[in-house]
Amino acid sequence: MRRLRLSATALGLTAALGLFAGTAVADQPTRMEHDLLGDKAVPASAYYGVQTARALENFQISGTPLARYPDLVAGLAVTKLAAARANAAVGALDKKKLAPIERACEAIAKGQYHDQFGVDLYQGGAGTSANMNANEVIANVALEMAGRKKGDYAAIEPHDDLNMSQSTNDAYPTALKVAFIRGNDRLVPETRRLAAAFRAKAAASITILKMGRTELQDAVPMTVGQELHAMAADLEAAAQQLLDAERALYAVNMGGTAIGTGLNAPKPYAARCARELAKLTGKPIVVASDMIAATYSLQGFVVYSAALRNLAVTLSKIASDMILLGSGPRAGL
């Protein structure tokens, strides 16, 4: 059922973005937008802009849009919200623009407008098109909330206002970290809930004797409860490792801009942005101790990936054991 829903979402995105097999839908009302490459027609109803429209044409690779991953879209919105508040606080962003930008980011973080995030997960650069997709959608939603028309960038500009004091190289990895943190907030409790279920079954079967095995051969006696208790302990350890690994995601390079030197970002901005992210996520987000290292290194992602892999291996092991234990019914293990 979930796959069917996702497929419907993908079809909805295709229609909303005005694309089918790479061909624009005919007779669709458009508005003209301009970038350094020239003018381009964008669907009038779209909240994205010219940069996203070009990316939709250039990067039809996997067929998997950003919208398929709501935590990532929300992570982009939360990151942009923190950046806007930090820029306003240090006097870089006109505070009159902040209110509609805040409302737009909050709406996207709550799940609205996700059908406008159609850029392919595989794209040129280090997330440049995804970053601009977020900038353009937030800008146009903010414009509409301020009573203006989409594309009225003299009032709120996707790059100058929404990407202020930022680069894709600090905004996108920070958004990814926020996305993983949001996912972890659901994954850890569910893992612990599964562990609790195994522990309850273990308590109910602690006196049932069975044969313990090594390499599938008879070894020494044990109880079913002992076996299930071990599975519960393994899951609890995996959940704790996820929590421990999450801490590797707390150091962000927002304010480092393109390579970590912080060029074109006001000096107080980085610390203020980290504080705003901490408020929005409820986590102790901090500025990375070395912004250049944090910009080129994937260490935090590798640490968290290892914890995810550990959980996957743990679940696979338990599932395999359950298959063997459920063999039979007359002459099984």
Predicted regions and their residues:
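Conserved, well-structured ligand/cofactor-binding cores
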Residues: 4-6, 13, 20, 24-333
